[in-house]
Every structure is written in structure tokens, then in C-alpha cells.
């Protein structure tokens, strides 16, 4: 199994380290042809408007959407979650628009208000998950076909719809690989 990690900006190397800790190979994806031999794709954090511009410049939107419609599992973290959302509150920025969610950008404040906390995610076991929130979005609303996996202060921060998984936080910035393992189980 080989997982692609979109490598235009953000913590893509940290995602690759998490995948390696799970015993899985990964490649950095910057061009459409690199999507051909992967079994899943992680879209990392970063700045979502910049990411959208870069994805457009590198002609990645259509190939990712096509692969996703054909069943390619996607995992979006922070800005990656924004890119997967069908709706972004108050924004018309470019996005993949694959997941039936509406997100609010920078919902937990500015960079200086970034924080870490522990989340209970029953799908990942009893031990809490350390979650790093950096200028994080949250999910304002979900369609009936979206499963909410975790909330923080009553705000949805982790959700799954079919072969799409999104997190408002950065699991790759901790040593806990359970969320990456959950994504990998979606592929097998």
C-alpha cells in the first residue's frame, strides 16, 4: 500500500512520518500523474486559499475529484478539511467540495490562540487523543450521511463520510498514530 500526501505546503513530511510509523509507504504528490499509483491521499494543513491556488496552478483539482469519485480515500486535516468541504461559511474560495459539510475557517481564533487538548474518540479506543489546533476550522453542519467522530466545546472537529475523513486538528504533530491507522483501515 502506498499513500500519497499532497506536498504543496503544510506538514506533509510529518504526515509521512506518521504513515511510516504505521508501517506504510508514502509519496509526496505535487503533480497529477503522482496520483496514479496511490491507494489513499492525505491533504494536510496549511493555508486553504493558498493551497487552492497551488492546486489550481498544478492542475490537481480535476484529477483528485475524479480519483475520489472512483473511490480513492481522502483524509483532510485543518486546511485539508476546508478543501474537502462542500461549503465554506462566507467564502467562495476554490475547494474540492467532496464532503457534505459546511466549515468555518479560523474558528478558534488567530495563530496566537492555537492550543492543544485531549479528545475522546470512541472509534480509536478509550485513551484520549492529543489534538493540536492551529488557526483551526470547525464543522458548522453535516448532512445525515456524515458521521461525527469528535467534538470540542460542542463544535464538530472530526467527521467521516464514506471514504472521506476530516480533522480540524493536526494528528501528524503528535506521536499518536491512531487517526492515521483509522484512515488506513478505511482503505483495506
UniProtKB/Swiss-Prot annotation:
GO terms for biological process: glutamine catabolic process; pyridoxal phosphate biosynthetic process; pyridoxine metabolic process. It comes from the Bacteria. Its EC number is 4.3.3.6, 3.5.1.2. L-glutamine binds at residues 46-48, 105, 134-135. Pathway: Cofactor biosynthesis; pyridoxal 5'-phosphate biosynthesis. GO terms for molecular function: glutaminase activity; pyridoxal 5'-phosphate synthase (glutamine hydrolysing) activity. In the presence of PdxS, forms a dodecamer of heterodimers. Only shows activity in the heterodimer. This is Pyridoxal 5'-phosphate synthase subunit PdxT.
Amino acid at each position: 500500500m502506498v499513500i500519497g500526501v499532497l506536498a504543496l505546503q503544510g506538514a506533509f513530511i510529518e504526515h509521512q512520518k506518521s504513515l511510516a510509523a504505521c508501517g506504510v509507504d508514502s509519496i509526496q504528490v505535487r503533480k497529477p500523474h503522482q496520483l496514479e499509483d496511490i491507494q489513499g491521499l492525505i491533504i494536510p494543513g496549511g493555508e486553504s486559499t493558498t493551497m487552492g491556488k497551488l492546486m489550481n496552478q498544478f492542475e490537481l483539482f480535476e484529477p483528485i475529484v475524479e480519483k475520489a469519485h472512483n473511490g480513492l480515500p481522502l483524509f483532510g486535516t485543518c486546511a485539508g478539511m476546508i478543501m474537502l468541504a462542500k461549503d465554506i461559511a462566507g467564502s467562495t474560495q476554490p475547494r474540492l467540495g467532496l464532503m457534505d459539510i459546511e466549515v468555518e475557517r479560523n474558528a478558534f481564533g488567530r495563530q496566537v490562540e492555537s492550543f492543544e487538548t485531549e479528545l475522546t474518540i470512541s472509534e480509536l479506543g478509550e485513551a484520549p487523543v492529543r489534538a493540536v489546533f492551529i488557526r483551526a476550522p470547525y464543522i458548522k453542519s453535516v448532512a445525515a450521511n456524515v458521521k461525527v467522530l469528535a467534538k470540542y466545546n460542542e463544535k464538530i472537529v472530526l467527521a467521516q463520510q464514506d471514504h472521506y475523513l476530516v480533522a480540524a486538528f493536526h494528528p501528524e504533530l503528535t506521536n499518536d498514530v491512531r487517526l492515521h491507522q483509522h484512515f488506513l483501515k478505511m482503505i483495506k
